[in-house]
C-alpha cells in the first residue's frame, strides 16, 4: 500500500480543515515546497495535493506552487480541487503533475469525465467524498443524490481505475478511519482505492494495509505529530 502524505493549499499556504469546514482552518506552513521536500526526505515517493481554493471556486490559484513542487522534488504528484475542464487538466499535467483527481466534475458532468478518460486514461482519478452516505461536491459544501456505492459502480463502468475515497465526517477529526466503508468498497469493486480521512495512528495505517488497499492519505496526523511519516512508510513496506 502506498502512503500519500497530504498538502492542502489555501492562499499559497499549507492548511488543514476540520471535517471539511472552511471556517475551521489551521495554517501549518507558509512554505509548501519545503513541506514536500520534508516528505521526500522522510522517504515518501508520492504526495497528495488538494487546492482547497480551487475546490471552492473552480479556479487554479495555487498552480504555481504545484509546479514548484513538481520541478524541485522527485515525488509522484496527484492533485485535486476545482478541476472542471480539460484545459485545467492539461495545465496540471504540463507542469509535471502525474495524476489529476476529478471531484465535482465527475459527479455532475459525466460527458466531461468520459472525455478526460479518453484523453488521459490512468492519469485521471476520481475523488469520492462521502457525507452521510452520499457523494459530496463543490468543496464538500453540497451533497449530490448519489449514494457512495452506486457512484463507485458507475465510475468503474465508465472505465475509472483509481478512486480516492474520503469520509468527510472523519477528516481532520483524529478519530480513526471508516474501515468498514473501505472494506466494503474493496470487496465490491476492482478499483484501486486510496483511503482518506481520519488516518490518525499507526494502527489505522496497518488496518488499512490489511484490506489490501492501493493507498492511504495522511494529513493532520503528520502535522500534529501523531504519526511519524517514516513509521507509516516502514509499516506498509
Regions found by a protein language model. Name each.
Residues 8, 39, 47, 92, ...:
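Conserved, mostly hydrophobic/aromatic
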Residues 12-15, 19-23, 90-93, 97-171:
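Conserved anion-binding
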Residues 46-62, 104, 164-175:
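Glycine-rich, proline-tolerant flexible connector loops at the mouths of alpha/beta enzymes
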Residues 48-51, 78, 101-102, 125, ...:
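Conserved beta-strand positions in the central sheet of alpha/beta enzyme cores
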Residues 53, 61-118:
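Glycine/small-residue-rich loop that forms an oxyanion/phosphate-binding "nest" at active or ligand-binding sites
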Residues 57-78, 114-129, 174-201:
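Alpha-helix-loop-beta-strand connector modules within alpha/beta enzyme cores
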Residues 77-96, 181-182, 186-215:
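Catalytic cores of alpha/beta
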Residues 94-112, 197-201, 211-229:
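Glycine-rich phosphate-binding active-site loops on the catalytic face of alpha/beta enzymes
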